[in-house]
């Protein structure tokens, strides 16, 4: 172990002050930082940095933005009309831009998106030269806690045996449960697709907290974290699938990942394996998953995301007993908002001195 500069993960989880003295393993740090920081355009340090936002930040959050650098000028608007009117003044936007905004965004150099995923952003903006950063990794602590909670509900029989007792207002007699319905995670293998913020954090929690063996794939070359036994490129995906006891969708939504978890994948999984969908619903074929659950191809699924959100009440997923679902809420927590503001402030500070920005998005790759 040796002292190094804090990674974006330590910064986002602990805050700027705590991160300054953080000691972590260098290999793990590099593995989590999947995207290289973006170098902002050169600018005169004395010029005011006008930041435009329509987001309803709290007053104390706005004060933190102003504290990032002495020349920060905030332009806070409440309506789309105000946003368009003030856009020509802005150098930085906290929010999003559309193709229709671009003619007025003549001075905008950098957009800080409010979400981790950027697949829904306007195509014209995504092909523009404006730098883009996102909120990746700020959601990871909350999402991965939800993921482990879902997995425990499935493996420990909580969702199938213990939750329904409240609807019936009766508890099954002691000794009637079957040991076969209660699986232990220690020694099991988790396979993660997408070793970004969610994937790398989940790997560490599964391995260090539950003694699981973790393997994974990622489209970007990166050092293997200590918590991961094997890390390969996406070509290893179908080799990995039959090996794992838990298969996790944690990759961004791109043309390459859309519906990658399909009938072939679910049929290739162990009958005792579980599927977790954490990043984007468009990564899996929902009807194929329903068949997998109903026909026993897999043991169960935990879903925080769905292809269409929310799914209609007539969707057959609601007929499945071996599934745990949440309405895309796994990233929610008061602490998440603190991490979001920490990232905004740190990136404003970096921008003001011409330092690389954190969480840079490769617009061409889509994440």
Where are these regions (language model features)?
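N-terminal secretory signal peptides and thylakoid transit peptides that target proteins
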Residues: 2-18
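An N-terminal-biased, well-structured beta-alpha scaffold segment characteristic
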Residues: 8, 29-132
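Glycine-rich, N-terminal phosphate-binding loop of Rossmann-like dinucleotide-binding domains
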Residues: 15, 97, 115, 249-251, ...
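C-terminal helix-to-coil terminal segments
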Residues: 33-36, 133-134, 138-146, 154, ...
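Short, conserved loop/helix-junction motifs that constitute active-site signature segments
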Residues: 101-107, 124-128, 266-270, 292-296, ...
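Phosphate-binding beta-alpha-beta segment of Rossmann-like dinucleotide-binding domains, i.e.
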Residues: 130, 135-189, 201, 209
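Glycine-rich Rossmann-fold phosphate-binding loop(s) that bind the pyrophosphate
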Residues: 195-196
């Amino acid at each position: 172990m040796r002292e190094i500069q804090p990674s974006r993960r330590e910064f986002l989880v602990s805050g700027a002050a705590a991160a300054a003295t953080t000691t972590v393993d260098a290999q793990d740090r590099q593995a989590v930082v999947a995207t290289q920081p973006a170098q902002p355009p050169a600018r005169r340090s004395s010029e005011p940095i006008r930041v435009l936002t329509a987001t309803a930040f709290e007053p104390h959050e706005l004060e933190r933005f102003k504290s990032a650098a002495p020349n920060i000028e905030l332009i806070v608007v409440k309506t789309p009309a105000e946003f368009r009117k003030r856009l020509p003044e802005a150098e930085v936007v906290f929010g999003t831009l559309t193709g229709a905004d671009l003619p007025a965004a003549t001075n905008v150099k950098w957009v800080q998106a409010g979400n981790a995923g950027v697949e829904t952003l306007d195509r014209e903006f995504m092909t523009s030269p404006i730098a883009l950063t996102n909120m990746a990794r700020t959601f990871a602590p909350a999402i991965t806690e939800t993921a482990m909670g879902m997995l425990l509900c499935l493996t420990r029989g909580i969702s199938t045996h213990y939750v329904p007792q409240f609807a019936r207002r009766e508890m099954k007699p002691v000794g009637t449960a079957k040991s076969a319905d209660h699986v232990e995670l220690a020694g099991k293998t988790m396979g993660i697709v997408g070793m970004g913020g969610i994937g790398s954090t989940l790997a560490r929690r599964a391995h260090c907290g539950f003694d699981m063996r973790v393997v994974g794939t990622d489209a970007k070359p990166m050092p293997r974290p200590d918590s991961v036994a094997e890390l390969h490129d996406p070509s290893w995906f179908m080799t990995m699938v039959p090996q794992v006891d838990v298969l996790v969708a944690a990759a961004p939504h791109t043309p390459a990942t859309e519906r990658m978890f399909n009938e072939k994948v679910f049929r290739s999984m162990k009958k005792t394996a579980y599927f977790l969908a954490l990043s984007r619903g468009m990564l899996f074929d929902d009807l194929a998953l329903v068949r997998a659950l109903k026909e026993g191809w897999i043991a169960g699924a935990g879903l925080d995301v769905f292809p269409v959100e929310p799914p209609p009440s007539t969707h057959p997923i609601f007929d499945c007993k071996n599934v745990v679902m949440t309405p895309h809420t796994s990233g929610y927590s008061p602490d998440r908002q603190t991490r979001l503001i920490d990232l905004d402030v740190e990136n404003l500070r970096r921008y003001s001195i011409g330092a690389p920005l954190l969480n840079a998005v490769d617009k061409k790759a889509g994440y």
